Amino acid sequence: MAFIPTTRSEMHRRGWEQLDVIFVNGDAYVDHPAFGVPLLARWLEKHGFRVGVIAQPDWRSVEPFMALGRPRLFFAASAGAMDSMVAHYTPARKLRHDDAYTPGNRHGARPNRATLIYTSRLKEAFRDVPVVIGGIEASLRRFAHYDYWENRVRRSLLFDAKADLLLYGMAERSMLELAQRMGRGESLADIRGLRGTCWVEKAGHHLTDHLEIPCFEECGSDRLKFAEAFRLASREQNPYNGRTIVQRHGDRLLVCAPPSLPLEEAEMDSLYALPFEKAPHPSYGETIPAWEQIRCSITSHRGCFGGCSFCAIAMHQGKLIQSRGQSSVESEIRELVRKPWFRGSISDIGGPTANMYGLSCGDSAAMKCCRRESCLFPKQCRHLIVDDRRAVRLLHAARDFAGVRHVAVSSGVRYDLLERQPAYCRELIAHHVGGLLKVAPEHLVERVTMLMRKPGLAVFERFLSRFREESRRLGKPQGIVPYLISGHPGCSLADMLELALALQRLGLRVEQVQDFTPTPGTCATCMYYSGIDPETGEKLYVATSDREKGLQKALLLGHLPGERKKVLEALALLGREELATVLLTAGRSEAVSAKRPHSVGQGVIHPGRERKAGRGKGTKKAR
């Protein structure tokens, strides 16, 4: 099967003079289901549509956007697998100098606010052709949202981009129905109420059975109204009971239909059976780091019911787990093993959270009226069926393939869930670690983990004890590398000191700490901007200055010479100078240097891996 056309000559080789849908993408074109635009393009192609891809066009002129001509139906624009601002800037708002989704890892192949810029250029090139926007950037900016890089509330991206329709979430259903209806002659302006979409109406337009949340103007001027808008919208994310949401922007209305229904197992299997080339487009002469990272990985499912407050998965993929069948996964492994570059190691079998594969709610009636954002917090839902047999069978099958030497589970596990999955836990420790297990407690102080919607210290200690005991029993020299966040809303300098002392007591040391980044669409970002917990209304302490955020981070890195001055300053502020000798010595440690991925809950190589790069060889991550 050939690549999706990217040039006129590739179109002509297929005998095509015009395409039905043209995708414009901020990432390089890698024909693999781990990348959203190629997945949707192949999905439409399967259903008889002629599609093309314009990857990373030069936005400084209009000509690159005209490369494939005028589509018969519409353009579909996406910033790529990450929000373009997250991709371009560090948590300190400093410009990055690399881009894993670009050949040669080069920065600068897409603009800031790429969805907005692409839409503007497409409208300039073909004013009368509809432009549909989607992807993580559009999804998480679909309502009025706080923008960290401008430190203000911005309008829905649909208004700023002046697009015709916004598709949010995993868009296979909405994209296909839109193309089919337009293909039958319907005007996009007449297609309203399609699940998983947002559109604009004039004020006064009559809508039934909807929820109106505080308007853009209120959100921009009143932080409590912003928190209220977030709280109301986040409770409508269950596709079975979510209502249409309306948010006024001046004299117009943003209308957001309920989320798309989840895919059934057979539909998931059919997606991953599409004829992908499983390679970057041959026009690229340099390697694409994101492709190198995932080319030996397998997506087993999508969705996550953890509901971490700093993570965007729930607002994008949803909390309902959509799993592939084992035979579908086995078919992909069989294909992978035949690749000439495959060397025997599968780098990952998983999703956003690997040990959620095959899990579901045990009460369909309860599920369809549920408004919980997490099935695990504040305590595990009594309706959740936690059965690890299906996941264990999948891992066994993967290891048994001829030509497979090792299977990693590097997309992360929830260690609180592992307490009810003893067989899976044993499998993980015995066969799928290979040296270091990266775990993501994010914090260990209860008042902070509660705000993060994460398990607390006691749960982590039980997991750590079990991991060490099982590793010793197996004679495996395995260790733990903890992932931690500094500067999270509600976290004070004293909390970070308490965390640092807990790590010392547990014999753990970190080499990288993630400074909290307020990314659009998350609960933690709402906390950061509003200064309150949107669920309880409790006022929160929020570290906003670069100085304090730097001090929080330094308290966990006292063994590094470059952080010594900041550690001493932090201890002086807390009146705890006597702890200097404790924090400024290396101490016992299981950890080695492990670079943390540069986003929390935003970067996505594919449906199922929200954190993308920097995992050392032979390492896995647990949440």
UniProtKB/Swiss-Prot annotation:
Residues annotated to bind [4Fe-4S] cluster: 304, 308, 311
* A Gene Ontology molecular function term of the record: 4 iron, 4 sulfur cluster binding
User: Where are the residues of the annotated region Disordered?
Assistant: 594-623
Cofactor(s), by name: [4Fe-4S] cluster
Bias (Basic residues) = 614-623
Keywords of this entry: 4Fe-4S, Iron, Iron-sulfur, Metal-binding, S-adenosyl-L-methionine
Q: Return the Gene3D superfamilies for the record.
A: tm_1862 like domain
Q: What is this protein called?
A: UPF0313 protein Ppro_0556
Q: What is the lineage of its organism?
A: Bacteria, Pseudomonadati, Thermodesulfobacteriota, Desulfuromonadia, Desulfuromonadales
